[in-house]
Regions:
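C-terminal motif of bacterial Sec signal peptides marking the signal peptidase cleavage site
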Residues: 15-18
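Bacterial N-terminal signal peptides that target proteins for export
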Residues: 1-8
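Extracytosolic secretory-pathway proteins
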Residues: 22-300
Length: 300
C-alpha cells in the first residue's frame, strides 16, 4: 500500500518550485514586516559567484500542542470561531507566543493521520530532502549580518545538488553549494531586511511541483507564509504555513493509492478551513511544516 498521498498532503508546501510552461521566471513576493532594502554580493570562483544561503535540511509536520494551541500563521487574516462560515466552522488556534487566528487544521489531526500511514511521513520526507529532491534554498544576496541587515535580496527556490553530503546525525552538513534546479522558477523578495535574525515571506497563489519517491506532482498552494529565525549556533529554525487543495490531494489519492483514498478523501472535507466555494464548503486545508536549516551557498 502506498503512503505517498498522505505525504503529499503534509509536504506540498515544502517543494517551492512553481510550475511554468517555459523556462525559469522570477516572481516578486510580498514581504512581511521585517523587510526593507536590496543588495547583491558574493565570492567569485571563475565564472561563478557563490552567494550565502540557507538550505532546509529537516521538515516535519507541526502538530497542535493542545486543542487550542498550535504553531503556525494567520493565513486568512481573520480570527475564526466555530460559527465562522468563511472558515467552514473551524476554530482557529492560538500560537505558543499568544498570537490568535492561527490556521493549522492539519496539525489538529496529525497524530491520528500519522498512525494511519504505513510508512512514517517524516522518514519519507527526510529521504527526499537528503537525496536533494526537496532541497528548499533561500539565497541571501548581499548579506552582511544574519541578525540585522537592511539591504538583502531574498530568492526562494528548489535547489539542485546531485548528491548532498549527509553527516553522522543523518542530516545535510552545512557549507554545501547548490544551484537553482534547472527549469525551476525563482521566487524573489527585493528590498528586504533581516530584523533580529528573522526572515519572513508571503505569497498568495502558486502552483508547485513536488517530487517524492519516483512520482512528480503539481499541487496548488495558497496563502503561503515562510519564516526563518537565525539561532546562536548558526542554524535557522522556522515554519512554513499554507493551504493545500482538497480536490487535488483527493485526485492523487484515487490515482496512486486507491486503498488509502478511502481514509484520505472523507477526512479532507472535515478539516478544510480555507476558500469556501459556492456551496459554502471550504476547498483548502491549512497546514504547517516545521523547518530546520543550515548555512549553504548558491552558485550562479
Amino acid at each position: 500500500m502506498k503512503t505517498l498521498p498522505l505525504s503529499l498532503l503534509f509536504a506540498a508546501c515544502a517543494a517551492l518550485s512553481a510550475c511554468a510552461d517555459e523556462g525559469p521566471a522570477e516572481v516578486e513576493l510580498s514581504a512581511g514586516e521585517p523587510f526593507e532594502g536590496s543588495a547583491s554580493s558574493g565570492i567569485a570562483f571563475g565564472e561563478l559567484t557563490a552567494r550565502p544561503a540557507v538550505v532546509v535540511r529537516e521538515i516535519i509536520v507541526a502538530g497542535s500542542i493542545s486543542s487550542s494551541v498550535a504553531p503556525g500563521f494567520d493565513l486568512d487574516n481573520r480570527v475564526s470561531n466555530a460559527t465562522d462560515r468563511e472558515a467552514c466552522g473551524k476554530k482557529d488556534f492560538t500560537s505558543p507566543e499568544g498570537t490568535t487566528g492561527i490556521d493549522n487544521q492539519l496539525g489538529a489531526v496529525w497524530a491520528s493521520v500519522y498512525d494511519l500511514a504505513g510508512v512514517p511521513v517524516e522518514g519519507l520526507v527526510r529521504a527526499a530532502v537528503n537525496d536533494g529532491k526537496l532541497a528548499l534554498v533561500v539565497e541571501l544576496d548581499g548579506l552582511d549580518d544574519p541578525w540585522n541587515d537592511d539591504n538583502v535580496t531574498l530568492r526562494l527556490f528548489r535547489g539542485y545538488n546531485e548528491k548532498p553530503i549527509i553527516g553522522t546525525t543523518g542530516v545535510m552538513q552545512g557549507g554545501q553549494t547548490f544551484e537553482v534546479r534547472p527549469g525551476a522558477p525563482v521566487i524573489v523578495a527585493e528590498n528586504a531586511s533581516i530584523v533580529d535574525g528573522r526572515l519572513r515571506l508571503s505569497a498568495d497563489d502558486y502552483y508547485l511541483e513536488l517530487e517524492l519517491l519516483a512520482e512528480a506532482f503539481a499541487i496548488n498552494v495558497i496563502n503561503m507564509v515562510f519564516e526563518l529565525q537565525y539561532q546562536e549556533d548558526g542554524t535557522w529554525n522556522g515554519y512554513l504555513g499554507c493551504g493545500v487543495s482538497v480536490a487535488e490531494i483527493s485526485d492523487i489519492a484515487r490515482t496512486y493509492a486507491e486503498s488509502e483514498s478511502r481514509i484520505i478523501i472523507p477526512l479532507l472535507p472535515n478539516i478544510a478551513d480555507l476558500r469556501p466555494g459556492s456551496d459554502n464548503k471550504c476547498t483548502y486545508v491549512s497546514a504547517v511544516l516545521e523547518l530546520k536549516g543550515i548555512d549553504a551557498f548558491v552558485a550562479r
